[in-house]
Amino acid sequence: MKIVVATDAWHPQVNGVVRSISTTVDGLRGMAHQVEVVEPSLFRTFPCPTYPEIRLALGCGRTVGKLLAEFQPTCIHISTEGPIGWAARNWCVKNGAPFTTAFHTRFPDYVSIRTGVPAEWIWKVMRLFHGPAERTFTATPTLAAELQAHRLPKTHHWPRGVDLTEFHPDGPPHPAMVDLPRPILLNVGRVAVEKNVEAFLECPVQGSKVVVGDGPALAALQARYRGALFLGAKHGAELASAYRAADVFVFPSRTDTFGLVNIEALACGVPVAAYPVAGPLDIIGDNERGIHGGATRIGALDADLALAIERALRADRDAAVQEAVHYSWDRCTRLFLDGLAEPTCEILPRPPDGADAGNRHVSRKCTRDSSGLLFR
């Protein structure tokens, strides 16, 4: 099957959205699907306001349409609500091409936090963007219910995974953390206001606080919290070693849709302390034993983050590892594939040289066999 993924989030950006999309693309290619990624490096870009390290495509509308026509995709998936996402969405709507979208980020909440604009105003924009899609992919049932409450009822469950060959409890701890006073409390992620890292750094708890990540709030937090250790962004084996060195992983965000870092921590045998909000609730569970029926606690959720940390210190590290086993990227990729829009409607032919790429259709009926492959 030939799949186009249109996304404003791509390398060299470092965040959970990019990891989720790129890992899924790799998985699809490993299943012998042809995947074309329409991403910012294909265009002139400009720095995103307040996020200069994120580059947004400039004037990409016509080019995105031409690329979609040239690629001749069987299915189109639009991952983000940025310029590339809007260009792909508008092309699909104009040409009657079915497409799916994903809701990776609580964009209405983030905009409201940063600008004071009421979140409901942004939800109107989200309904406009996602409304025409065949389905909107969501990481958790809680997020699906939230979208349905905002009049976006067509959702598809697409969870996240963890690479268990990379994130596991066996291996050396990070050398910068081994001699720190215990307990060692770790936070990993973008260092930005919406991630609520300051709530972690303000927690009145004993031990050492370590922050792994980069972002627009890093310099200010480093200057203010000199007793914390800031290691910057880490990847792969070095990131896994940071998890292993920790006694508790602290996730202070109240706005994440999932929190991929939570299952990375669990895979390394590190219990999670978080607020009882969507994301942590969908991973740790109401009973704090994980959502897959574990017998002992893998973390702690509490409206008082300090209390959550204290309880998480007594959680079962082996149970945390066992819970993470359920998060297979192969399963996640197959669920992604299952949710793609059935390609039973019109798909544009490749335009001749110099022709408009936007207006000619040819109908192609497709059927899906049990393997997920399509035959015309």
Which ranges hold each PLM region?
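Short alpha-helical donor nucleotide-sugar binding micro-motif in glycosyltransferases
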Residues: 68, 130, 241-246, 336
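Donor nucleotide-sugar binding/catalytic pocket of nucleotide-sugar-dependent glycosyltransferases
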Residues: 124-172
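Conserved donor-binding/catalytic core segment of Leloir-type glycosyltransferases
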Residues: 176-210
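Nucleotide-activated donor-binding/catalytic signature segment of Leloir-type glycosyltransferases, i.e.
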Residues: 219-238
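Aromatic "clamp/platform" in nucleotide-sugar-dependent glycosyltransferases that forms part
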Residues: 254
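Short hydrophobic beta-strand element within catalytic cores of glycosyltransferases
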Residues: 271-276, 284-285
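A charged, aromatic-enriched C-terminal amphipathic alpha-helix characteristic of glycosyltransferases
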Residues: 314-344, 348-349
